[in-house]
A protein has these predicted regions:
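Bacterial Sec signal peptide processing site at the extreme N-terminus
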Residues: 2-26
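Surface-exposed, polar/charged faces of alpha-helical domains
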Residues: 27-31, 42-93, 97-100, 104
């Protein structure tokens, strides 16, 4: 009887990994947008240093990125510090256009 009962004992299922809360996801979205802006900024600097375009054009492109970063942080301020998926999508479209202007 004991051996048949012991055979029925099943190890409990491990608890599922906790899902990140929506605010953490929103913060991560903002962090991703900021990281992309930082990468594009470095590309602008590299292109200016390599002579692909003059410093005034590089300055204009940096200004464009600064405006997008400010938009991102303004949007985030409305939601307690993070971005919604739709906001991130809009910002990424703007960054796609900026990347095209930079020459990526």
């Amino acid at each position: 009887l004991l051996s048949s009962l012991a055979a029925c004992v099943v190890a409990p299922q491990p608890a599922p990994a906790p899902r990140p809360n929506p605010q953490q996801i929103a913060y991560e979205r903002l962090h991703q947008v900021d990281g992309r802006i930082d990468n594009l900024s470095r590309r602008i600097d590299a292109h200016v240093n390599q002579g692909y375009y003059p410093p005034p054009q590089g300055g204009a492109l940096h200004h464009r990125l600064d405006v997008i970063r400010q938009e991102a942080h303004d949007m985030a301020a409305q939601h307690g510090g993070g971005l919604s998926g739709d906001e991130q999508r809009v910002l990424n479209q703007e960054l796609d256009n900026a990347a095209h202007a930079i020459g990526e």
